[in-house]
Amino acid sequence: MIQMQTNLDVADNSGARRVMCIKVLGGSKRRYATVGDVIVVSIKEAIPRGKVKKGDVMKAVVVRVRKDIRRADGSVIRFDRNAAVLINNQSEPVGTRIFGPVPRELRAKNHMKIISLAPEVL
């Protein structure tokens, strides 16, 4: 579960390393985001010569959360770190590669480009 002020890793090669959630999109009183949700983030740490720089405000899709993700068949999946992928205003990833596994739940939220770039879908 991601809320305002949550720090996340960046799971793409956009140049950002750490981001902080500054808003959960989807309603004025929406408090938490989970896998597949879109959030607004501020870049807190970035590498030199990346596509983004520190202080930029962008949208991101949450791809991994430490909170248990319960599936319809009763199984549970959980990741070690919270992570997100930066997207532009057209909901396309800023980076060209995705690092680490992503869950199948992204398919239901229509993030097919992220699924196709990911090395492993759990």
UniProtKB/Swiss-Prot annotation:
Any one GO biological process: translation
Assembly, in brief, is: Part of the 50S ribosomal subunit. Forms a cluster with proteins L3 and L19. In the 70S ribosome, L14 and L19 interact and together make contacts with the 16S rRNA in bridges B5 and B8.
Q: Which Pfam families match?
A: Ribosomal_L14
Q: InterPro entries attached here?
A: Ribosomal_uL14, Ribosomal_uL14_bac-type, Ribosomal_uL14_CS, Ribosomal_uL14_sf
Query: What is known about what this protein does?
Result: Binds to 23S rRNA. Forms part of two intersubunit bridges in the 70S ribosome.
Concerning its family, UniProt says: Belongs to the universal ribosomal protein uL14 family.
PANTHER family assigned to the protein according to its UniProt record, in alphabetical order = 50S/60S RIBOSOMAL PROTEIN L14/L23 (PTHR11761), LARGE RIBOSOMAL SUBUNIT PROTEIN UL14M (PTHR11761:SF3)
Q: Which HAMAP family match?
A: Ribosomal_uL14
GO terms (molecular function) for this protein are:
large ribosomal subunit rRNA binding; structural constituent of ribosome
Q: Which SMART domains does UniProt cross-reference here?
A: Ribosomal_L14
Q: Which CDD domains match?
A: Ribosomal_uL14 (cd00337)
Protein name per the record:
Large ribosomal subunit protein uL14
**NCBIfam families recorded:** rplN_bact
